[in-house]
Each structure stands twice: as structure tokens, then as C-alpha cells.
């Protein structure tokens, strides 16, 4: 994502690792994925599903270098991204936390499942420093709770959920009017995190 100035002109200099300026607490690496309402449209702008997948892949493998830009110093979100050592993926701050689930929209759900499990296992724990960054209105813990259940609301306000990789063999959500939503993950284990087939009320779900 390349920013424009106040007159609607493209900025004359682009550095994908530059924080600040047009990007709040992040860089182009993070805000490029903020088309939560239209992942398919984003993929077409990027040249299709394969091209978008390659860009997502590169976020996790690129050097975790940075330019602190208009901030003028290394803010804690930058320091956390470097410490997490997952390329340019900065789970310690909220703007990019949904990006892992975008693989679902471009036909590569196993990559969502892989990265979701990696983040839950590597960046969260029950100790005094159990969060990998700031919490900001409960988003970082909400990401974990949804991901542990096996699904995630990529676009706020839309009653749709992207599928991840449930952490538990079985969990039950108690819904209004005495109803339950039960998630069963047969054969679930840290090494067996990929979903071979999903059923919803007995019918195959994709």
C-alpha cells in the first residue's frame, strides 16, 4: 500500500518498512492488508490469489528491519515486532492481526492453520508477560480466544467467520435460548493442526 498526500497525490518516496506518517503504529507491510471488507478485491489488485499468497508469505520471511519514520524514535510496537522475529509480521500490535486469516480467502487455508497455531504457541503464555504486545481494548486476547475456538471475525460487523485451527479437541459455546454451538476437532494435537474436512450440522462445510 502506497500512501497519498493531503492533495490526493502519490507520495514521492516509498519505503515499505517506514512507520508513522500515513500509517499509525505500523508500516505499509501491515496496513496493506486492511481491506477487511473485500479480500477478494484486494487479491485482484495484487494480481490474483497466487500473487497475494506470495506477498503474505513474504511478510513472514522478510527481514524484520524498520525505518521509524515520522515517529523519530523506536516506539514499543517496533521493538516488539523485532523481538517476535516473525519477519515483518507484528502480532504485538493490532493492525495486522487479521492478516493470517486472509489465506482462507485465497484458497490456502492450511497456511492460516499453520500460522495461527504458531502464533498461539509462540507468542502467548499464562505467565506475567503472557501477551506479546499491547492489549488495546481487548483485541490481543480476543484474537487468541477466537483463534483457540477455531474461527475468527475478519471483518467487524459482518456475521461471517474465517476458519482457523481449534486448539481444543472439543469446546462448547452456550448460546441464548438454551442452544449450544459445539466444536469438535478429532485427532487434534500440536503436530496435527491441519483440517482435513469440516462438517457443519452433519453437512460438509467449506
Predicted regions and their residues:
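C-terminal beta-sandwich/jelly-roll accessory domains of carbohydrate-active enzymes
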Residues: 187-206
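Active-site core of glycosidic bond-cleaving carbohydrate-active enzymes
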Residues: 1-182, 187
